[in-house]
Amino acid sequence: MEDRFSAITNLHGDHKQAIFGVYVGHGGVKAAEFAAKNLDKNIVEEVVDATFLKEEGFKGGSSCVTALVSEGSLVVSNAGDCRAVMSVGEMMNGKELKPREDMLIRFTLWRIQGSLVVPRGIGDAQLKKWVIAEPETKISRVEHDHEFLILASHGLWDKVSNQEAVDIARPFCLRTEKPLLLAACKKLVDLSASRGSFDDISVMLIPLRQFV
């Protein structure tokens, strides 16, 4: 299992500030573990990347997707092949919050130096000429019709579409009683696995209305 995650709520003592992340290691788990433990402390991506590369004996790299909620703003950043999808309003739209960078790489290099598909990520010292740590970032205001956010690794999105994920998670997330977030995550993981995903599958669900 090379996936890791982090969730820090009540950031700086403010219940409306939080940071969440899903991290997917490749070539080992060290980079994913390092990012999960340090990214909240060093929001600027170069700090984490440069610090990791200095760690003796650390190899491999990590893709990641993070969501920072602060002062009513939602900052979603992605480096690699993870993805963030938001459920918006009564129309239940599954809105992806990152460019499909994996599609760009498929039509250019396919694999970087024969070993890596994604052009962004943390670590990968031997591929630093081609792999950058700077994430794709989208900033938006948290609105009343923003229901929940799904952060997940490629293991989910390889087999489950944005809209499918939203449709499956929504009944669990918007219950009038206590939301069943863990059950929703398990449902999504099981669906991807049943369709033949052999990747590690990590899913995180974040209710957004608490941050409005």
Curated annotation (Swiss-Prot):
Cofactors (names): Mg(2+); Mn(2+)
Parts forming coiled coils: none
Residues spanning the signal sequence: none
CDD domains given in the database record: PP2Cc
Enzyme class name: hydrolase
UniProt KW keywords: Hydrolase, Magnesium, Manganese, Metal-binding, Protein phosphatase
Domain PPM-type phosphatase, chain residue ranges per copy: 1-208
UniProt catalytic activity: O-phospho-L-seryl-[protein] + H2O = L-seryl-[protein] + phosphate; O-phospho-L-threonyl-[protein] + H2O = L-threonyl-[protein] + phosphate
Repeat found in the keyword field: no
SMART domains per record: PP2Cc
InterPro entries, per database record: PP2C, PPM-type-like_dom_sf, PPM-type_phosphatase-like_dom
Homology family: Belongs to the PP2C family.
Protein name: Putative protein phosphatase 2C 53
Record organism: Arabidopsis thaliana
